[in-house]
Amino acid sequence: MAERKYFGTDGVRGKVGSFPITPDFALKLGWAAGKVLATHGSKKVLIGKDTRISGYMLESALEAGLTAAGLSAVFVGPMPTPAVAYLTRTFRAEAGVVISASHNPYDDNGIKFFSAEGTKLPDDVEEAIEALLEQPMDCVESAELGKASRINDAAGRYIEFCKSTFPTSLSLEGYKIVVDCAHGATYHIAPSVLRELGAEIIEIGTKPNGLNINEKCGATDIEALRHKVLEIGADVGLAYDGDGDRIMMVDHLGNKVDGDQILYIIARETLRAGHLKGGVVGTLMSNMSLEIALKQLGIPFLRANVGDRYVLEKMQENGWKLGGENSGHIIILDKNTTGDGIIASLAVLTAMAQHKLSLHELTGAVKLFPQVLINVRFAGGENPLNSEKVKAVAAEVEQRLAGKGRILLRKSGTEPLIRVMVECEDAVLAQKSAEEIAEAVKNS
């Protein structure tokens, strides 16, 4: 596979106004993608975005590029990333585009593509697009230019799809739910889904102004959600991130329920229903208690590299249907082709309604082990993880933790940092062990 110049693991991303997140690059990217995709079928590309102010600029530039290449641009407006994947499939579009930087601040943005099936573009298609980005732009004949249109009921279509994943025999009548949409792409979707299923909804993070996405709210900052749940005595709190592919939850006591615990609840319910195909995929950062709890249910568990892309790859390699990250990306392939915060939250709410149990009771089997993370900066040059001294200290700590904890040492891919993670039932031992390894890295 050729080295990527523009496409990262999650499309093209960066600071707005700095290359490559500029209108001229978006125009060229739309044109290059259009040229490659125009050789296929429907000649329609669906474009969705989150609520960042820069989305207007970037979608207009993409539209110009796509139509110049002979493809039609179909806008769905602010829409969660998983909704774009779903609508791309059902609309029979040639591809889908999401303009979002997920959980990042408002002045970042990104552009990523979905295939006609609602999955990541194949490597050879991305490579063909990158190759064209190096070529001068041209324009098709006037009669072959693409058009621009809008799906006015896109939100309604996705709301109905989300509701269809919740059993018709159940209702959320009687539940008081706080929903935090991070002033992001779920702001007009999630509250409607939950209200239509019968719940009483209290909204926070549903007033986007283009500049406030993810600001002290959403899946990456649940303090406002926790406060509101406790203040009004809600049954549960749900926090989505800016583009709606992550979910974090808060139980009625104000405890955070993360992606590992959510994954466990969904795995157990899927097993009980007789629908679990194979096992569950987590990541190197998944809590050891998740692995132990799944093992007690007889559910196989595999770890992928950190990143929902790698989780999905390992799921596909093994033919499994369920995976996720502790950060709240939960992928249920029986329901959607990518991480979907709303659908994952509905799966947990199904378990609550089905068994008449609180979220706190459902998470009882997964008592998360304390995790200590220390970032150690080094001077560059030789990788400290190759040092015999570091290896010896790490081996000693591993022996000490055998059966009751684990360590993970990773070199950052973007800066001279070694990330030291120690996880153990005993928080004091975890802290002491992490500091020991960090000290060895510093002195290597």
Swiss-Prot record:
Bound cofactor: record note: Binds 1 Mg(2+) ion per subunit.
Tell me which InterPro entries the record gives: A-D-PHexomutase_a/b/a-I, A-D-PHexomutase_a/b/a-I/II/III, A-D-PHexomutase_a/b/a-II, A-D-PHexomutase_a/b/a-III, A-D-PHexomutase_C, A-D-PHexomutase_C_sf, A-D-PHexomutase_CS, Alpha-D-phosphohexomutase_SF
Reaction equation(s) it catalyzes: alpha-D-glucosamine 1-phosphate = D-glucosamine 6-phosphate
Tell me the protein's name: Phosphoglucosamine mutase
Provide any one GO MF term from the record: phosphoglucosamine mutase activity
Which GO annotations describe the biological process of this protein?
carbohydrate metabolic process; peptidoglycan biosynthetic process; UDP-N-acetylglucosamine biosynthetic process
Question: Which cellular component appears as one GO term in the record?
Answer: cytosol
**Into which EC class is this enzyme placed?**
isomerase
Cofactor(s) recorded for this entry are: Mg(2+)
Taxonomic lineage is:
Bacteria, Pseudomonadati, Pseudomonadota, Gammaproteobacteria, Pasteurellales
EC identifiers of the protein: 5.4.2.10
